[in-house]
Amino acid sequence: MKSKVDLFVINKVREKRKELGISQRGLAAILECSPSFIGQGESDKFDIKYSVHQVFLIAQFFDCSPADFFPPINFDI
């Protein structure tokens, strides 16, 4: 089951991906994974989530900080 933190990260990545006009297939190419991994990660039906390494790769590609994808320290977990 995805934790609240996992869901926060997934939602932030999806928001940024859509903001920049990048498809799930495009993000999959960046992460060298299948497009279905991205789709399942963004779905509530699967327990797929991004690794810390993947978040760093996403941040590098989007030219932002990995911290942009994580909740604040006072986040209710």
Describe the function of each predicted region.
Residues 13, 27-28, 38-41, 69:
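Conserved hydrophobic/aromatic packing and binding residues within compact polymer-binding modules
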Residues 32-49:
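Recognition helix of helix-turn-helix/homeodomain-like DNA-binding domains
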Residues 18, 29, 60:
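Alpha-helical residues within the helix-turn-helix
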Residues 45-60:
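Short, basic-rich loop-to-helix N-cap that marks the start of a DNA-contacting helix
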Residues 3, 60, 68-77:
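Short, charged recognition helix plus adjacent turn
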Residues 1-20:
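A short, Lys/Arg-rich alpha-helix, primarily the initiator
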